[in-house]
Curated annotation (Swiss-Prot):
Belongs to the MCM family. It catalyses: ATP + H2O = ADP + phosphate + H(+). ADP binds at residue 372. The keyword rRNA-binding does not apply. Its EC number is 3.6.4.12. InterPro entries: MCM, MCM5, MCM5_C, MCM_CS, MCM_dom, MCM_lid, MCM_N, MCM_OB. One of its GO terms (molecular function) is single-stranded DNA binding. This is DNA replication licensing factor mcm5-A. A motif (Arginine finger) lies at residues 513-516.
């Protein structure tokens, strides 16, 4: 196969020089270098009317004067100047990129003269390449593309520390002290094969032994290099397959340009290196011709923050005009809500809340350096069969960056970050988890209630501070996880039981308070609704089409995905003065309980909201403004945000299911629970036991509600004061 990256075999009869090249080959190289030099000198942009500028000549001069010894060349510019040169660079990049760098060094020498004293020696120039061609996929790389230029997108999941690699080495014989200098080492991850014999012949001296040479470190010329691990994008992974990885090699100015979690598009040379040796004897013969693939990077484009795969730069002017018209529609909010999972009937408020989550609020950086998150977190609790998982699956496809995980199959390290040992350097490196890979997008966590409590605690920091702090194996760092969390969970009893109240939920208050909206999804028995739902499901199954049965005026999935990415990239609304005043007044009313008193005439219930919930309403208002591409969130947006908060979190709190969450408990309930607990402790002493049925009946005769009695019993069991015995019929007092 042509173009194999060999080991740089050293010929002992050509000491001190590079590989001998024939006159024809040398002349061809000189000719190609001259054409590259002409391209860098003469390529210009502009018109006769506006005037011409020499693009690369001016760039070289500007970068060199700033001490940046690199230049970025666009392949399209090279192809328009000389198509043969671009073809050479695509098909044989290893040889021709070196010629291009030598040509760039000569042009830089010309344009920077005269240089100041002490800087007479011209520095080497690194040439980086970029292209607007459509990227390939890691899975599509085959042996035919070996040693060709390739362009692939993906996510950086690991990065090693920057190390040094020799480009020119000097070697010396241990026996006769013969020194050979300035030996070129091939770029990339391949090493250099030392000569086995010393050919220096001196009269009266015995021949030097085998393997006499060693490297003189002080006389070597080194460059920085770094290896990265690239994982293919989640949307490019076929269903049911594992995402594939590729090792990347970066050197010089390409080092330290990316961190784990960055979405990048790589331009590089598809290369091979020798596989690691097997330890078992006799098996080396099997893998003698097998090589491991890697990519030698020659250009990196990092996707802009928060826009991900549907980068705003890829949006055409026609699409931008269409988005402006879409945002100007008076019913854009309803249109977007209808476009979310159109195959699912009903759940209009949940779809509107998901629309707010997809667009997100505005992230704020305060003067003291602290940040306020702009992403909206949403939790759906309730009965099975209410399309919670289907909504999560749709959001994963609809979001510009979406990662879907299930609670039981997710560990703390898999969600946040893990530390592992690099097989090459044996140093510890860090690999980002789901919440790092979803930076700028949405993490969908299904079966949230099935997660282990230890794993659920790991995402506390990621949900509120939007960072993940790691202190393991000598690595102390912080990764960004600026993503929304959309979670779905079932109740403890499978179906929602209104009589059980808080017992339906087995979540800590600390995790519940981090969700901006909490929806309780109930499968209510309503004949008219059941008839409509059954008809809708039958239409979906019979016609296998959702568009015919869904409402008019919705946006298709691809347009919606691009529109969300465009709004997130271009718009960052703030609350208007009138909206802020209105929200402040309503917040005071809700804190005092006046609004609850107006809504409920039978009894006065005080359900205060805290500053965390106030910030949630601000974020929802900003997302409604962002949906319309407005610079400010208006009073109408605040009204709708308050309504969404009312039908989600406040209604859940009213049902008693969120008591204990950030003050979501009435004063009367707390007093009643403490009275029941005191009487229960008086009823039976420590070490005694009593029938559970009889004690519940005694309290029911005293007109206490049954759910309050069960709540006290569960609280005492959780604290370890009582326990069940004899098939859960008897209560035994421990302390």
């Amino acid at each position: 196969m042509s173009g194999f990256d060999d080991l740089g075999v050293y010929y002992s009869d050509s000491f001190g020089g590079e590989q001998q090249v024939g006159d024809d080959g040398q002349a061809k190289k000189s000719q190609l270098k001259k054409r590259f030099r002409e391209f860098l000198r003469q390529y210009r942009i502009g018109t006769d009317r506006t005037g011409f500028t020499f693009k690369y000549r001016d760039e070289l001069k500007r970068h060199y004067n700033l001490g940046e010894y690199w230049i970025e060349v666009e392949m399209e510019d090279l192809a328009s100047f000389d198509e043969d040169l671009a073809d050479y660079l695509y098909k044989q990049p290893t040889e021709h990129l070196q010629l291009l760098e030598e040509a760039a060094q000569e042009v830089a020498d010309e344009v920077t003269r005269p240089r100041p004293a002490g800087e007479e020696t011209i520095q080497e120039i690194q040439v980086m390449l970029r292209s607007d061609a459509n990227p390939a996929n890691i899975r599509s790389l085959k042996s035919e593309q070996m040693s060709h230029l390739v362009k692939i997108p993906g996510i950086i999941i690991a990065a090693t520390a920057v190390r040094a690699k020799a480009t020119k080495i000097s070697i010396q014989c241990r026996s006769c002290r013969n020194t050979i200098g300035n030996i070129a080492v091939r770029p990339g991850l391949e090493g250099y094969a030392m000569p086995r014999k010393c050919n220096t012949e001196q009269a009266g001296r015995p021949n030097c032994p085998l393997d006499p040479y060693f490297i003189i470190p002080d006389k070597c010329k080194c460059v920085d290099f770094q290896t990265l691990k690239l994982q293919e994008s989640p949307d490019a992974v076929p269903h049911g397959e594992l995402p594939r990885h590729m090792q990347l090699y970066c050197d010089r100015y390409l080092c330290d340009k990316v961190v784990p979690g960055n979405r990048v598009t790589i331009m590089g040379i598809y290369s091979i290196r020798k596989s690691g040796k097997t330890s078992t004897k006799g098996r080396d013969r099997v893998g003698v011709g097998i090589r491991s693939s890697y990519i030698r990077v020659v250009g990196i484009q990092v996707d802009t923050e928060g826009t991900g795969r549907s980068a705003a730069g890829a949006i055409t002017p026609q699409e931008e005009e269409e988005f402006r018209r879409l945002a100007a529609k008076p019913d854009i909010y309803e249109t977007v809500a209808k476009s979310i999972a159109p195959s699912i009937y009903g759940s209009s408020d949940i779809k509107k809340a998901i629309a707010c989550l997809l667009f997100g609020g505005s992230r704020k950086r305060l003067p003291d350096g602290l940040t306020r998150r702009g992403d909206v977190n949403l939790l759906m609790l309730g009965d099975p069969g209410t399309a919670k998982s289907q909504l999560l699956k749709f959001v994963e496809r609809c979001s510009p960056i979406g990662v879907y995980t299930s609670g039981k199959g997710s560990s703390a390290a898999g969600l946040t970050a893990s530390v592992m040992r690099d097989p090459v350097s044996r140093n510890f490196i860090m690999e980002g988890g789901a919440m790092v890979l979803a930076d700028g997008g949405v993490v969908c966590i299904d079966e949230f209630d099935k997660m282990r409590e230890d794993d659920r605690v790991a995402i506390h920091e990621a949900m509120e501070q939007q960072t993940i702090s790691i202190a393991k194996a000598g690595i102390t760092t912080t990764l960004n996880s600026r993503c929304s969390v959309l979670a779905a969970a079932n109740s403890v009893y499978g179906r929602w039981d209104d009589t059980k109240g808080e017992e339906n939920i087995d979540f800590m208050p600390t995790i519940l308070s981090r969700f901006d909206m909490i929806f309780i999804v109930k499968d209510e028995h309503n004949e008219q609704r059941d008839m409509t739902l059954a008809k809708h499901v039958m239409n979906v199954h019979l016609s296998a089409r959702t568009q015919s049965s869904s409402v008019e005026g919705e946006v298709d999935l691809n347009t919606l995905k691009k529109y969300i990415a465009y709004c997130r990239a271009k718009c960052g609304p703030r609350l208007s003065a009138e909206a802020a005043e209105k929200l402040k007044n309503r917040y005071i009313l809700m804190r005092s309980g006046a609004r609850e008193h107006e809504r409920e005439t039978e009894k006065r219930s005080s359900i205060p909201i805290t500053v965390r919930q106030l910030e949630a309403i601000v974020r929802i208002s900003e997302s409604l403004g962002k949906m319309k591409l407005q610079p400010f969130a208006t009073e109408t947006d605040v009204e709708e945000a308050l309504r969404l908060f009312q039908v989600s979190t406040l209604d859940a709190a009213m049902s008693g299911s969120l008591s204990g969450v950030e003050g979501f408990t009435t004063q009367e309930d707390q007093e009643m629970l403490s009275r029941i607990e005191k009487q229960m402790k008086k009823r039976f002493a420590i070490g005694s036991q009593v029938s559970e049925h009889s004690i519940i009946q005694d309290f029911l005769k005293q007109k206490y509600p049954e759910h309050a009695i069960h709540k006290v019993l569960s609280l005492m069991m959780r604290r370890g004061e009582i326990q069940h015995r004899l098939q859960r019929k008897v209560l035994y007092r421990i302390k």
